[in-house]
């Protein structure tokens, strides 16, 4: 069968830059699914995306769907013929509907009887007859939270659509998509190249767009060019560009013909904390800051323009003029803020509401102060410094700088605390209290900062759960999931052996009588433990491993982590699945026992060699593993327990647990109970799959 190249390009108004790549990838994924569903064979699919277009190029596309044989079953033979052997009306009607006579029908014999059947050949439809509807369906399924209407049309899309091009090799595929008829016309760059031109063949894309339209349609190629050019521009004056990937992607989505330029700002602005300057450059202007080899901010920035200018100096000058007032604002805010100490701003936190039922931010920092001291005492941190950092933790919210540049909260608190002469540990904790801010982010460095970060997160969790405002579905306005995962990461990765129950009880206690949820402690602990599942799955650890540990509900995250790592290692052993199955069998047997399970094994009642051998090993392991369990060395313990595979298998093959003799039965149940309890010291491995 012949293979073809298919192109679809949707020409639009400027697409939302932060969503551009995800829209293009979703378009490609959706179209793959549509082709597969339509049974049209295809090879590679390339996706293209620029501010004013989404496009796909499909290679090795089949000419048509394959022909299929479809079996159409008719009435049962017993119902198809009368007593004289003549076709009934039901048989004739079915045959006529399939374009055959009853005599031409085949017979199908099944265990339920004999049936008339006709095998019809259904010819596949040509690809060109299907592509329009497949493209429309793929576009309709794009993840677009907010649609737009334009002109007098009722059609909706993420942005207005101006051109639609569908080409199968050199043939224009007729289609009417998003209110536009398919045509060969595509649009070039808004200011350079040909504004509109025709494309003759799908194979010309995207080269024709580059040559005639001055558009680099390949998103990844544009991104690579911007990155390489920015790195070279910074290196030219001994600098290193801060090419944050999220900003790099956004800038890539803003331009069709990227041109990288370098500009300067006045050195006097370097007296302002770098974080504030960087916020202005990256957040407001989409510029890339530049640092020297030692990580010190330089008075330069790199930006990307969407046009080749005959006089780049004018564009550079224009961007310098744009950023200067923003940097001047930052300088003014910083100098103004320095006129007051952080501590003097504490009373003003009484005017800021944390949550209506939970009170003000001032009340929150007083709770954080208490809980941070409670935690610091348990992890060997300086209690006074942890409490001081907790009390000052939100004071920078009252500064001009944070009021204008919200993302600088925490870090500006650190700078102002240093200026005020606060202890360095306290100053750093003010910045690190929000760590980790996102998945993979760094953790607080000092123990005092860990105490404040934990106290802040636990206060939010206890408070919001305490008034019954649990996160539902994807709605989590107080970022409780992030707070829980962050707290767990701090405790496990910083090796802080803390008990969640004890921590949450303290966080609840300092709220006094504000909380109405009577089960808040259990709810918060269960919620936090539940976050482990997603966190470990991201590390490639199976859900069954986490569930096996969750079944034991260990409430010390560090201990929980050790158990998960131990069970994950155990799962890789040859004996693991057999012992998991045996534990499940033991669990089922013990579940049927009424009353309290026996634990005392009487040696004189052991009759069979298999039960004697198992009893001996279980008794030896109980003594041997006790210190390992006490030390939390669960991996070593489970590795030793793997040796029970053979005696357990032999026991079940040779011993009748539910013996008629009640004394024998009770003794064997006690043996199995002791066996199971050995494993339950770590996890419920019967849940392993």
UniProtKB/Swiss-Prot annotation:
Binding partners and assembly: Tetramer of two alpha and two beta subunits.
Gene behind this protein: glyS
Family as reported in the entry's similarity comment: Belongs to the class-II aminoacyl-tRNA synthetase family.
Superkingdom, taxonomy of origin: Bacteria
Species annotation: Aeromonas salmonicida (strain A449)
Disulfide linkage: none
Keyword Protein biosynthesis: yes
Keywords in alphabetical order: Aminoacyl-tRNA synthetase, ATP-binding, Cytoplasm, Ligase, Nucleotide-binding, Protein biosynthesis
Documented EC number(s): 6.1.1.14
Keyword ATP-binding tagged: yes
Protein name: Glycine--tRNA ligase beta subunit
Coarse class of the protein's main subcellular location: cytoplasm
Pfam families according to UniProt: DALR_1 (PF05746), tRNA_synt_2f (PF02092)
GO molecular function (one): ATP binding
Positions in coiled-coil regions: none
GO CC terms in record: cytosol
Upper classification of the organism: Bacteria, Pseudomonadati, Pseudomonadota, Gammaproteobacteria, Aeromonadales
InterPro entries reported in the protein's UniProt record: DALR_anticod-bd, Gly-tRNA-synth_bsu, Gly-tRNA-synth_heterodimer
Compartments where found: Cytoplasm
Signal peptide bounds: none
Catalytic activity: tRNA(Gly) + glycine + ATP = glycyl-tRNA(Gly) + AMP + diphosphate
Biological process per Gene Ontology, one example term: arginyl-tRNA aminoacylation
